[in-house]
C-alpha cells in the first residue's frame, strides 16, 4: 500500500482516544468527507461489544498517497489508514447497509463534510433496485400488503427506503 495512490481513504476514530473536537478539526481541513454514525452496538465474532467508534472516509479531489491521508487522520486521532477500492460500497458500509448480520445504523446520521453528499452517494439506480428488492422481501416476510403501511414504516424506520418509495413515482392516498 506504500506506493498506492487513490482519491478515497478511510480510518477508524475511537471516541475514547480522539480529541473531543475531532469533527471540527476534520471540518477545518476542507476535505470532502463522511463520518459514520457512532458505532456503539457492534459486536466481535464472540459476541463481545466492540469499543465505540466512527468510520471516517476522505474524498480527495486528486490522488493522494497513504502518507498524505495519514497526515489528516493523525490530526483527528484516526487509527490506521485504509485504501478504499469502491467509494460507494464503503459509503454504504458506514451504516452496514449491505451487511444484514451487523447492526444497521441510520443513514440520516452520517455527517457530510465540505460538500460531500451522502444521500447523493447512495442514490444510484442499482441502489434503488436493491432497496426495492429489500422492501419487497420485507413485505413478503411480514405479510404486508398495504402500501400506506410500508410507506409509514419506512418514514419512521428506514429513511433509505422512504426516499426510494417517494422518488420512484409511487402514490398513496387515504381514499
Name what the model sees in each region.
Residues 51-53, 66:
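Amphipathic alpha-helical transducer elements in NTP-driven molecular machines
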Residues 2-4, 48-51:
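Short, flexible turn/loop "capping" segments at secondary-structure junctions
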Residues 39, 60-62:
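Short glycine-rich, polar/acidic loop-and-turn segments at beta strand-coil junctions
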